[in-house]
Amino acid sequence: VLHKVVQVRLYPSKEQQILLAQTFGSARWWWNYALNKSIEVYKETGKGLGRSALNAFLPALKKAEDTKWLADCYSQVLQATTLNLTTAYKNFFDKRAGFPKFKSKHAKQSIQYPQNVKIVDSNIKLPGNIGVVKAKIHRLIEGKIKTVTVSKTPSGKYFASILSEVEGDVQATDEGKIYGIDLGLKHFAVVTDGEKVSKYDNPRHIAKHEKNLHRKQKKLARKQLGSNSRNKYRKVVAKVYEQVSNSRQDFLHKLSYKLVSDSQAVIVENLHVKGMVTLEDSLTLRYRNHNLAKAISDCGWGTFTNFLAYKLERKGAKLVEIDRWFPSSKLCSNCFYQISELPLDVREWTCPHCGTHHDRDGNAAINIRAQGIRMIKAEGSSVSAVGGEVSPILGRKSKFRHSPMITEAPTSTVLGKLG
């Protein structure tokens, strides 16, 4: 079974926009209420509230005078909100995400329909009182529709992310190239296939819009709090951020598509982006360096890895993530000698053992690729690799892990190839 996600643009009528706003508000209020109730119960008893316990509050809330408007919301939307909250708690306790946060009406709004959504005459029919919403469906929706997430961006656009389930097995492939990728700031990605090293420049998306963004943020700051003009100008600023996000997603999709199209495996480092940009203590989360944090966040390394993962999974190819502590830059790819220190400002170095001169990032990509091939062979999979014999690392071996396959696809489409 394969899961696919297609995002489509929605064009609701004025009446439907009002109904969607009410549904967004109900789901957001219920999320915040359930989260607050869970926190209170945990403080009192030391135990949390499960999905069933939270849903048990809904019937009484729908009958109460102050919250009877909850009854107007499609019931499965509220139940899906409960499920998402309990999933957020599970991810927190499994150390895959931070603690669940309260939702704001000024952020992106979203609701989820777990079933009963249909495609009608190239439009989308939502259950409940919203009905058929005009949509721009740009590609075929394959298989059975499982869930549909309807969202509204801060700039005022509506989208539906359609998750479908397609029957059939994906055959694993052992044909194609094996890429090793070193992600960075000057060059977004340094890639090797065992024969040559290619460098892809960092587009620096935020830097291109920084002056425009700064100018519009200053105008927004001068607007009176709570005024209509401030609310309208908030959308103007949101549109600039949306342009930045769209250009980043476009670049990441095109580059990931280019690499996946002719590969049997892609090998990357398991980077801890949050640890790179912040210092975490018991009281707060602080930036290590504001400019560096902004540059790293702008790259979208984590999103790029996710894009690689789901594209490779659909093809039957592998994504391998090597341990972040693997000394890819300090290890000579020719003789496997490891130097003790290599400051960030040193971009080239010569191995004192064999005399090979290295480009820092190119050497790292070669080592990442070699380590990934060792991992693939260690688990018993066959690969056809070019670029010479892969030798074992001298000395102590680093720890590494094989990344799980990702079934959740991102909500953007591939627009074409690079270059």
Model regions: which residues?
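Gly/serine-rich nucleotide phosphate-binding loop at the start of the catalytic core
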Residues: 1-78
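Positively charged, helix-rich recognition surfaces that bind polyanionic ligands
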Residues: 3-4, 141-144, 154-419
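Generic detection of short hydrophobic beta-strand segments and adjacent strand-loop junctions
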Residues: 6-10, 131-135, 200
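Hydrophobic (often cysteine-bearing) scaffold residues that line and stabilize catalytic clefts
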Residues: 16, 20, 27, 74-81, ...
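Alpha-helical coiled-coil heptad-repeat segments used for dimerization/assembly
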Residues: 22, 29, 80, 87, ...
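Short, Φ-rich (hydrophobic/aromatic) sequence segments
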Residues: 30-38, 81-89, 93, 213, ...
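Long, hydrophobic, amphipathic alpha-helical segments used as structural scaffolds
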Residues: 35, 39-42, 89, 93-100, ...
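Acidic carboxylate diad motif detector
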Residues: 52-154, 281-282, 298
